[in-house]
Amino acid sequence: MNKQILTLALCIGLCLAVGFAGSTFTPKPASWYYTTLVKPSWNPPDWLFPPVWTILFIMMGTALAKVLGTGWKKNEVNVGVVLFAIQLMLNLGWSASFFGMQSPLAGLVDIVLLWIFIVLTMLAFARVSKPASLLLVPYLCWVSFASYLNFTILQLNP
């Protein structure tokens, strides 16, 4: 198997695995916690989240593979990979905070940190591969929206 294809498959697989791990914290729509939260009228329907996140995780994995494909010997690559790993763990942490701990406040703290680390990752990736950085733009947009949604849910559920 071609090394680039293997790297791509492993990177996408890693991101999807983190997404799957995060989904274990996400309750079914009928769970008492989720149904008791007051949500804004513009809250997306529940069915929208899985396909959006799947696409985003595939794009994230592709971005990581592009950066790794430039070689580990560059300091910029190592910095980008570390930042990517941090934001990936913060992504997982949001599900654990918001749903697992049932805390919109903890979720908001986590998602703000996640947003910061996505931006830092994009900046680091841009030094190595502009296309890799651009692949993270939809992710940043979605997390920006999710941050505002999280903030609004916190306000509606004091």
Curated annotation (Swiss-Prot):
Disulfide bonds: none annotated. It is a multi-pass membrane protein. It is found in: Membrane; Cell membrane. InterPro entries: TspO/MBR-related_sf, TspO_MBR. Changing residue 146 to T: Decreases affinity for protoporphyrin IX. Nearly abolishes protoporphyrin IX photooxidation. CDD domains: TSPO_MBR. The keyword rRNA-binding does not apply. It comes from the Bacteria. GO terms for biological process: tetrapyrrole metabolic process. GO terms for molecular function: tetrapyrrole binding. Its main location: membrane. It holds the Pfam family TspO_MBR. GO terms for cellular component: membrane; plasma membrane. Binds tetrapyrroles and promotes the photooxidative degradation of protoporphyrin IX. Can bind the benzodiazepine receptor agonist PK-11195 (in vitro); this interferes with photooxidative tetrapyrrole degradation. May play a role in the transmembrane transport of tetrapyrroles and similar compounds. Belongs to the TspO/BZRP family. This is Tryptophan-rich protein TspO. It comes from Chlorobaculum tepidum (strain ATCC 49652 / DSM 12025 / NBRC 103806 / TLS) (Chlorobium tepidum). The gene is crtK-2.
